[in-house]
Every structure is written in structure tokens, then in C-alpha cells.
A protein has these predicted regions:
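C-terminal substrate-binding/catalytic lobe of Rossmann-fold NAD(P)-dependent oxidoreductases
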Residues: 1-62
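NAD(P)-dependent Rossmann-like dehydrogenase/reductase catalytic/cofactor-binding core
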Residues: 47-99
């Protein structure tokens, strides 16, 4: 994803925002680590990181999900949990599938 930065914002501001929010299934990676699908297979997590673009005031966001879990099925369970006041990760926070 390519995004233009707002005036006065930088990558550090954006990373701090997501780290403070502490979303249940959204994890921002440290340093310059590129997210890999192998890290999210069989989970409901979305791993992402933010990088500077070669064009001034633009950033690149790279994210990965396992579309079998984080896709429609996992999203439906997560939304149901929120609607019925269950823990957001109920039924979704389990060990990943074995190869």
C-alpha cells in the first residue's frame, strides 16, 4: 500500500499510533523486518510494517494475512465476538496448523 504522509507526520508517528492502540490481531513489526506469510499461517493475525518510499513524503505499507483464517471465516468470528460481547479473540487465538 502506498500512502502520502500528512504534513508533520512521519513513519515513527504512525508506528507509535499502532503500538499504543494495541489491536488484538494487528501487529506492527520492529525495525525494518518485512512481514512474511509463514509468520501468520493458521492465525487470525495481520502482520505489517511501514517503510519510506523513494518518493518524498510517501510511505509503503507491507502486510500479510492467512486468508483462510483472517479472511471471511475469521473475520466473521471476530465480528460475532464483538457484537455479542465475547472476548475479541474467543475461538481465534489458538496454535497454528501443523505443516
Amino acid at each position: 500500500i502506498y500512502l502520502k504522509l500528512q504534513k508533520g507526520k512521519n513513519i515513527k508517528n504512525i508506528k507509535n499510533f499502532f503500538e499504543k492502540k494495541n489491536y488484538t490481531f494487528l501487529k506492527i513489526l520492529k525495525a525494518n523486518k518485512i512481514p512474511e506469510i509463514k509468520d501468520v499461517v493458521g492465525t487470525n493475525y495481520c502482520f505489517f510494517n511501514i517503510f519510506p518510499d523513494r518518493i518524498k513524503d510517501r510511505i509503503i505499507i507491507i502486510s500479510v494475512i492467512d486468508n483462510l483464517i483472517k479472511g471471511a471465516a475469521g473475520q466473521a468470528i471476530q465480528n460475532m465476538n464483538l457484537k455479542y460481547n465475547f472476548k475479541e479473540d474467543e475461538g481465534l487465538n489458538f496454535n497454528p496448523i501443523f505443516p
